């Protein structure tokens, strides 16, 4: 699933980075990221805000097919986050990881933007697939 997300969201980042209204679009992404930072404390709320950030990235392309394709994956994305366990989910939803994506988009270079999303997804997949979990987490799924 992360390969598909990397392709889809990488395309979205590349499109957004080449838009003439880039500054305004980056500001919208930053607001969405600020919401993620404010969501700390409620893991379920964090998941929804994280998904909203990624959906927004797709929406900012103005490409309805891209958005609908992302929406078709949203349930599977949510499930993978919820079953990863709290510690892994929080790591993947970290503000610095998302800020790197925004910063890459803000360069206006589609290749840089796409690469940042690829890295974000690669790290998220590695984290979810790792056997390392804290004693507190014990890989317990997040119950909504």
Task: Report each predicted region and the residues it spans.
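Nucleotide-sugar donor phosphate/pyrophosphate-binding loop at the beta->alpha transition
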Residues: 86
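A hydrophobic alpha-helix adjacent to the NAD(P)-binding/active-site core of NAD(P)-dependent oxidoreductases
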Residues: 1
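Conserved amphipathic alpha-helical segments that form helical-bundle/coiled-coil interaction surfaces
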Residues: 4-83, 95-100, 112-122
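C-terminal effector-binding regulatory domain of bacterial HTH transcription factors
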Residues: 110-144
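Hinge/beta->alpha junction and helix N-cap segments in small-molecule ligand-binding domains
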Residues: 89-90
């Amino acid at each position: 699933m992360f390969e598909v997300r990397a392709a889809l969201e990488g395309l979205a980042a590349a499109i957004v980075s080449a838009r003439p209204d880039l500054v305004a679009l980056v500001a919208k992404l930053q607001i969405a990221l600020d919401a993620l930072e404010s969501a700390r404390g409620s893991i379920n709320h964090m998941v929804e805000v994280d998904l909203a950030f990624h959906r927004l990235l797709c929406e900012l392309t103005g490409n309805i097919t891209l958005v609908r394709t992302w929406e078709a994956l949203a349930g599977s994305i949510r499930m993978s986050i919820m079953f990863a366990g709290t510690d892994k989910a929080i790591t993947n939803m970290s503000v610095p990881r998302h800020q790197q994506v925004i910063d890459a988009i803000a360069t206006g270079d589609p290749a840089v933007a796409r690469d940042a999303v690829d890295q974000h997804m690669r790290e998220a997949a590695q984290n979810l697939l790792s056997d390392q979990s804290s004693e507190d987490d014990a890989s317990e799924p997040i119950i909504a």
